[in-house]
């Protein structure tokens, strides 16, 4: 309640500032500023209103003025009547009129004012009206805020409720205010009744809301986020908090920025925990062996990027060796994952699985290397002879184990009698100690791909035993060779591919001749399957018998593989 300011004259003649509280028949009740005196009643003739705002006159010498000063230290300042004796610049020499003895003081213009033009108050200076308050509005009228609009409309300086008499007291300095109060009283009480009804409803609704909120907020989650991760937890423009509030069942989310603490309230525990997953950001360190760092990162960071994408972490950081924030062990590189609790858990599962896989693969490779090393040691100490099929054995069969009449064993033959272009039909390992198994295979394949006798006779020979185009040479012929006249014309019946056509005799023998240094050889190999017309190749035993028969015939001596 606003109070009307007045000036009250004391026993010393000075006027003190006070506030009017009530009006009586011949006095008013006032309270003093700063309560330096108790509340008491003052007669009308000792009360006056302050001068109007802006009232000020020029002060000259010998003018009566009022000085704002105090009589002693216990009393507040008040306005004393005085007279100006002298003016020196901004300073005024004044003489107090209320004192018996002459008392002068030098003051500044701020402590001076012209004499108050208001006269002492009378009974008609104040107006008071009382309005009976209905019983249902008594509680409502006890609130000063309920009469704010009514006070302004009436023009009164005070509207208060008397709880003892159940009346509404209206004080004013204008008689018009009393008339307006009587005119607006019914309307004011009616509006108060409507306001009271609405206020009661609002209070009831507020109570229900509070009870519902307390019931709905039975489940509460509280957690702290690191200060450097608060930006991630809040999100861009509070996106994460808004997303957490949209979770069904969440009633409120509060954030204490000073302590970085989140408070989540909800109707059930699941809703509160789900909202927490959106806001609880943390940092986790996973130790990775140094030898597996490259395989964990992958080419161009493909593998580590896949882990980040699938887990949902915000970022991953690989700490440097000289980073002192995280303790590092020898041979270990820390991988720091930043994100929500769930995303960090997912990243940990993915990375652990990949690390276990890499360790198992390295273990399998190590075992393979150990096995290979053992095999190399065993092979170096005792290497078994290579197993070769029968068709690669050639002349090492049991039928050829003996020596042909007039010839030497193949195992004892040297290479000194042969030219550089000589091709031997033997596949004996003892023929040349430096030959390898692959050399023998090539040699056998050469025998199988050698041209037939008829094919060979079509090529002309040179006198030194080498072939040349044009005419045939005069070298010796082996069995099954062409014995006709050299000058007799011969039809060219050989096929273009000499490898596909082999010359055979009537008994099924395969005629092959290799000439080098005027030497000839005859070799026969038994076919695996008989031909359609029943012809077959001779075995090694038949070949030996045939050679012996040839040696017994009178005529030129036959040279077999360079041996007479």
From Swiss-Prot:
Residues 484-505, 535-552 have a biased composition (Basic and acidic residues). Residues 222-251, 285-314 form the KH domain. SMART domains: KH (SM00322). GO terms for biological process: animal organ development; DNA repair; glutamate receptor signaling pathway; membraneless organelle assembly; midbrain development; miRNA-mediated post-transcriptional gene silencing; mRNA export from nucleus; mRNA processing. Residues 426-435 have a biased composition (Low complexity). Pfam families: Agenet, FXMR_C2, FXMRP1_C_core, KH_1, KH_9, Tudor_FRX1. Residues 4-50, 63-115 form the Agenet-like domain. It is found in: Nucleus; Nucleus, Nucleolus; Chromosome, Centromere; Chromosome. Coiled coil: none annotated. PROSITE patterns: AGENET_LIKE (PS51641), KH_TYPE_1 (PS50084). Homodimer. Heterodimer. Multifunctional polyribosome-associated RNA-binding protein that plays a central role in neuronal development and synaptic plasticity through the regulation of alternative mRNA splicing, mRNA stability, mRNA dendritic transport and postsynaptic local protein synthesis of target mRNAs. Acts as an mRNA regulator by mediating formation of some phase-separated membraneless compartment: undergoes liquid-liquid phase separation upon binding to target mRNAs, leading to assemble mRNAs into cytoplasmic ribonucleoprotein granules that concentrate mRNAs with associated regulatory factors. Belongs to the FMR1 family. This is Fragile X messenger ribonucleoprotein 1 homolog A. The gene is fmr1-a.
């Amino acid at each position: 309640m606003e109070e009307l300011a007045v000036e009250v004259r004391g026993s010393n003649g000075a006027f003190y500032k006070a506030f009017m509280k009530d009006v009586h028949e011949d006095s008013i009740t006032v309270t003093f500023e700063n309560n330096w005196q108790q509340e008491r009643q003052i007669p009308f003739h000792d009360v006056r209103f302050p001068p109007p705002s802006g009232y000020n006159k020029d002060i000259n010498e010998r003018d009566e003025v009022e000085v704002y000063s105090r009589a002693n230290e216990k009393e507040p300042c008040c306005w004393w009547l005085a007279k100006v004796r002298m003016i020196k610049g901004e300073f005024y020499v004044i003489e107090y009129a209320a004192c018996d003895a002459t008392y002068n003081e030098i003051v500044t213009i701020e402590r001076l004012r012209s004499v108050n033009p208001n006269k002492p108050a009378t009974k008609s200076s104040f107006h008071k009206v009382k309005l009976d308050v209905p019983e249902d509005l008594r509680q409502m009228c006890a609130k000063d805020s309920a009469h704010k609009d009514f006070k302004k409309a009436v023009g009164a300086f005070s509207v208060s409720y008397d709880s003892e008499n159940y009346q509404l007291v209206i004080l004013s300095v204008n008689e018009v205010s009393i008339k307006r109060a009587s005119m607006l009283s019914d309307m004011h009480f009616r509006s108060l009744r409507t306001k009271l009804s609405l206020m009661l409803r609002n209070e009831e609704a507020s109570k229900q809301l509070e009870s519902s909120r307390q019931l709905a907020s039975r489940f509460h989650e509280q957690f702290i986020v690191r200060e450097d991760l608060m930006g991630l937890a809040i999100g861009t423009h509070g996106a994460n908090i808004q997303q957490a509030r949209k979770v069904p069942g969440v009633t409120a989310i509060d954030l204490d920025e000073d302590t970085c603490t989140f408070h989540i309230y909800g109707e059930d525990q699941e809703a509160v925990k789900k909202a927490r997953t959106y806001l609880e950001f943390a940092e986790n360190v996973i130790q990775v062996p140094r030898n597996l760092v490259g395989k964990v990162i992958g080419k161009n960071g493909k593998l580590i990027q896949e882990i980040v994408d699938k887990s949902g972490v915000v970022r991953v950081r690989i700490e440097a060796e000289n980073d002192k924030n995280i303790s590092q062990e020898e041979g270990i590189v820390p991988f720091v994952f930043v994100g929500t609790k769930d995303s960090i858990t997912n990243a940990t599962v993915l990375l652990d699985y990949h690390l276990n896989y890499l360790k198992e693969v390295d273990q399998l490779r190590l075992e393979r290397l150990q096995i290979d090393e053992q095999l190399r040691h065993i092979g170096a100490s005792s290497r078994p002879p290579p197993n070769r099929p029968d068709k690669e054995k050639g002349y090492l069969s049991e039928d050829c184990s003996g020596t042909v009449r007039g010839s030497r064993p193949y195992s004892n033959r040297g290479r000194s009698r042969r030219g550089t272009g000589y091709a031997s039909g033997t596949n004996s390992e003892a023929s040349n100690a430096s030959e390898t198994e692959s050399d023998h295979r090539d040699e056998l394949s050469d025998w199988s791909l050698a041209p037939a006798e008829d094919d060979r006779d079509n090529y002309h020979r040179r006198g030194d035993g080498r072939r040349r185009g044009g005419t045939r040479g005069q070298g010796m012929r082996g069995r099954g060779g062409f014995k006709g006249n050299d000058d007799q014309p011969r039809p060219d019946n050989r096929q273009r591919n000499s490898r596909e056509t082999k010359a055979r005799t009537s008994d099924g023998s395969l005629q092959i001749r290799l000439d080098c240094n005027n030497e000839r050889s005859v070799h026969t190999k038994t076919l695996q399957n008989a031909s359609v017309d029943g012809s077959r190749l001779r075995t090694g035993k038949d070949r030996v018998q045939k050679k012996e028969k040839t040696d017994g015939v009178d005529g030129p001596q036959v040279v077999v593989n360079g041996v007479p």
